[in-house]
UniProtKB/Swiss-Prot annotation:
InterPro entries: KRAB, KRAB_dom_sf, Znf_C2H2_sf, Znf_C2H2_type. Residues 4-75 form the KRAB domain. One of its GO terms (biological process) is regulation of transcription by RNA polymerase II. SMART domains: KRAB, ZnF_C2H2. Signal peptide: none annotated. This is Zinc finger protein 302. Belongs to the krueppel C2H2-type zinc-finger protein family. It is found in: Nucleus. It comes from the Eukaryota. A zinc finger (C2H2-type) spans 280-302, 308-330, 336-358, 364-386, 392-414, 420-442, 448-470. There is a cross-link at residue 183 (Glycyl lysine isopeptide (Lys-Gly) (interchain with G-Cter in SUMO2)). It comes from Homo sapiens (Human).
């Protein structure tokens, strides 16, 4: 089952869109983005810190990333297999055996993508619409080009470019439904059933900054000459934003079936981070990271370390940003108010979560059982039920738990701590849920009272039986 990524819950704003937001809406956006990232980090689903999070933590505006990121120039890919053949990503490794890890931004032909979409009917995608720009001198037929982001994709190929005839388009990104993309793709396939596709020669996406793309060299081991028509167009700014994720230690994707390679001249400068190996590996779960600092933050998931302590209440946190958000609760300030019921919240993300109770919207659906959730964090917690993953282990007895809250409750059994005391009888409990359950005993005792003798019963049926004594009725007499 595919994992949730930060991009599944991320929202991108252009400079113009950001300018339309007021200060409260911007604060809400920042809170939601940071909380979603921390939720993913807490369960080990986010490997590198997204650039937008770094900007937000530095107090910068998120649209500034558009200026920093590099431009992308993918080149075409095609296949000789007809559309009726069932493609899968296993076939990709047959064509490109050296593949060890695929970029989140990679190039796919139309049939690869159609197969992937058909096997992920619940995925949501973002696509680039067809460009209206056409070169007058070139009469080559220009096709659709979609930059697809697979919301619930597999670990490899989470993003891809559909290039049906080997040409790339540039236009403003428009979010569309998967159904619309599939419909357009199938319309193209049905109207071009007799098209011939050449064998897969290469599968590579490369990114560079302030440079031009050189023509690939024809160094095929089979001696075949391959001519690549590359449109030197820039992806729109939002697509460039997506390409930022390659700078987190991802490996370049190479193919040994073709000798085609980019000319390593001054005209092409690749970021060093693209070729960097993931050398920092977690000894507990085997996950690899590009930076020692990221591994250190990840390690806190296993150790339970919470180095950031609140001076007001002593509560500890694993991340500094979590402590900052927590400290707002002590100030008593609640600037985020629900327009439906008037309830106020100290964090914008809390308001967002609360508003789902009014709308009833549950957009996050479990692929295993179909259960839906209003928040992605709830879905992540639920998924552990299916995987039976128990990542929270007690250091004292070794017992493992699915949820961190269960571990916290369990640890109190070792310490003997019972902070929850009943006001009625003084009995103490280690968990608030146990106290709530106990308090029902007191409330039930005072619930049903006989108006004749003032005797109290814990249930209505007992009261009815008792009242038969006063009326001299014998309801159970044969």
């Amino acid at each position: 089952m595919s994992q949730v990524t930060f991009s599944d819950v991320a929202i991108d704003f252009s400079h113009e869109e950001w300018a339309c937001l007021d200060s409260a809406q911007r604060d809400l956006y920042k809170d939601v983005m940071v909380q979603n990232y921390e939720n993913l980090v807490s369960v080990g689903l986010s490997v590198t810190k997204p650039y937008v999070i770094m900007l937000l933590e530095d107090g910068k505006e998120p649209w500034m990333m558009e200026k920093k990121l590099s431009k992308a120039y993918p080149f075409p890919l095609s296949h000789s297999v007809p559309a009726s053949v069932n493609f899968g990503f296993s076939a990709l490794f047959e064509h490109c055996s050296e593949v060890t890890e695929i970029f989140e931004l990679s190039e796919l032909c139309v049939f690869w993508v159609l197969h992937f979409l058909s096997n992920s009917p619940n995925s949501t995608v973002e696509a680039f619409s067809r460009s209206k720009k056409k070169k007058k001198k070139k009469k080559k037929r220009q096709c659709f080009a979609f930059l697809i982001y697979f919301r619930l994709g597999i670990k490899m190929g989470k993003q891809g470019i559909i290039n049906k005839e080997g040409y790339l388009y540039e236009d403003s990104p428009q979010p569309v439904t998967m159904e619309k993309v599939v419909k357009q793709s199938y319309e193209f396939s049905n109207s071009n059933k007799n098209l011939e596709y050449t064998e897969c020669d290469t599968f590579r996406s490369t990114f560079h900054s302030k440079s031009t793309l050189s023509e690939p060299q024809n160094n095929s081991a089979e001696g075949n000459s391959h001519k690549y028509d590359i449109l030197k167009k820039n992806l729109s700014k939002k697509s460039v934003i997506k390409s930022e994720r390659i700078n987190g230690g991802k490996k370049l994707l190479n193919s040994n079936k073709s000798g085609a390679a980019f000319n390593q001249s001054k005209s092409l400068t690749l970021p060093q981070t693209c070729n960097r190996e993931k050398i920092y590996t977690c000894s507990e779960c085997g996950k690899a990271f590009g930076k020692q600092s990221i591994l250190s933050r990840h390690w806190r998931i296993h150790t339970g370390e919470k180095p950031y302590e609140c001076r007001e209440c002593g509560k500890t946190f694993s991340h500094g940003s979590s402590l900052t958000r927590h400290q707002i609760s002590h100030s008593g300030e609640k600037p985020y108010k629900c327009i439906e019921c008037g309830k106020a919240f100290s964090h914008g993300s809390s308001l967002t979560n609360h508003q789902s109770t009014h709308t009833g919207e549950k957009p996050y659906e479990c692929m295993n059982c179909g259960k839906s959730f209003s928040r992605v964090s709830l879905l992540i917690q639920h998924l552990r039920i299916h995987t039976q993953e128990k990542r929270y282990e007690c250091r004292i007895c070794g017992k493992a738990f699915i949820h961190s809250s269960s571990l916290i409750h369990h640890q109190k059994s070792h310490t003997g701590e019972k902070p929850y005391e009943c006001r009625e009888c003084g009995k103490a409990f280690c968990c608030s849920s146990h106290l709530t359950q106990h308090q029902r005993i007191h409330s039930m005792k005072k619930k049903y009272e006989c108006n004749k003798c003032l005797k109290v019963f814990s249930s209505f049926s007992f009261l009815v039986q008792h009242q038969s004594i006063h009326t001299e009725e014998k309801p159970f007499e044969v």
